[in-house]
Structure formats: C-alpha cells, structure tokens
Amino acid sequence: METTFSMTRVQHIMRRDLIENWKSNLYGLLGIFAACFFPMLGFLWSAERWTEEGYPEVYSFERFCGNMLGIIGMVVSVAMIYYASHIMKCMDNKEKRISYLLLPATKLEKFFSRVLFVTIGTVLMILVALLALELTHYLLLPVFDLPAVYSQPMLVEVFSLRWAHASVDATGEPVYSWWLMQLLVWIFCLWNHSLFILGGSFWYKHPFLKTIGACLVVTILGGILFANLAEGGFLTRFSDWMQEHYQDTPQTVNGLLTIISVVFLLFTVFNWWLSYRLFTRSEVVKRKLWRL
C-alpha cells in the first residue's frame, strides 16, 4: 500500500463510518434539536406572558433571543466536546479495533478521517439541527399570541447578540482590542475541545465522563495550589511587580492577551499531536492501564 497521504482512502473510511454509524448520528441530531426545542417552547410561552404584562415588543424579543443564545451556546459546547471525546468510537472494543486497524489506509489517514468526523461532521449536524429549530420557530408562531417582531429570523438575532463590544474606560477608549479578545476566546475553546480529543484517544470506553473527571481532578488540584500561592503572598508580590514594571494601558492588556493566546494555542497543538501519537500506538489488545 502507498504510504503517501490519499484523500480517496480518507473518503472510503468516512463513507464506511457514515454507513455504520448512521443511526447514532441520527439520534445525535435529534438530541441536539430536542435540547434546543423544549427550552424554546418554554421561552415562547413566557414571551406570550410578557406581552400580556405590557413588556415592549422589542425588549420581549431581545430577551427571548438572549435566553436562546444561552441555551444554544450550552448545547453546541456540550455536543462538540461530547463527539470530540468519541473520536475513537470506532475502536471501543476488540472486534472494532481489529477491523479498523486492518483497513487499507495509513494511520494518518485513519486519524484524519476521525478528526473530520468529530469536528466538521458535528458542526454540520449542529447546523442542520439549528435550521430545523428556526423552521419550528416559524411553525409555532400561530400557536402563540406574540407580537409581529417574533416573525424575524431568530438565529440572526441570537448570533448578533454573541458579538458584544469591547469594554471602555471612563474616557470612552477601549480597554483592550476586541479582535484579540475574540481570538483568545476561540483559541480557548479549541484548547478545551482538544482536551476531549486527547481524552478520547486515551480512553476508548466512557471517554466523555472520564475526561470530565480528569479535568475536575486537575481543576481541584489547581485550585488548592492557587489558594496556597495566595496565602503565601505570591500573588500580591506578583501584582506589585506587574504594577511597577508595566503601565495599565490598552497596549499592556493587548500584549497580555497575545501571550495568553499563544500559550493556549501551543497547548492545543500539543494535545492534538499527543492524540495522534496515542492513536499510532493503538493495539488490538490494550494495556491494562488503558482499560481504566
């Protein structure tokens, strides 16, 4: 077999995954839709009550969209990390591992196909669920006695609320670069996603729960360390050193945002690299340590 990367072989692997997992993918799509639909139903009922109580129409619609933004954000976040943790679902038992490891493709092609499946595939699933949610929103309007403003596209308003403006100081000047802050948020999300990719590459059975458990343990240990540093006065000394050597200006804040973004980006790349290394060392019979 050729060792050069071939998208044709990747397509064959992905087609095989789609055929074998179409039922679980359909259930996942319905689950994402249901997780957004039932809260939306409750919010529409509440919006009808807001109208009866005399709330302004625009305020009522913005409040409804703000509530939906929180729900959609939470559902999308959970869906992305859940499917990321199942990147090695195709190898969660001995028979599947034998079948997958014997596929006529390089390990890079197999790993790349799984990456596409749990990233691009999940995004497409979410988009379909959200479009179905928007259509359902229009179909439900005649059921509720709502103002005409609710006939606007819900998702457009929801995503417009997502792009908040940067904070400003007393003079009206931005405290930091809005674009740098958005970049940091997205890189942090990618890093968080890569943690579940790494967890899914290490644990094949119940990877989502095990990765969450590992993250909780690390968070608790980090909290204890942070408390000890604060109690020892390290944070106070560090704050005094920062104030002495750096002025509290937008340039300083932007520099700090840039450094943090680069650090989290490097952590993200490392997690992806380590995930691939774990996959390349996959065996038919896993070591006992990996059976946790």
Residue ranges and their predicted role:
Residues 1-98, 107-292:
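Hydrophobic alpha-helical transmembrane segments of membrane proteins
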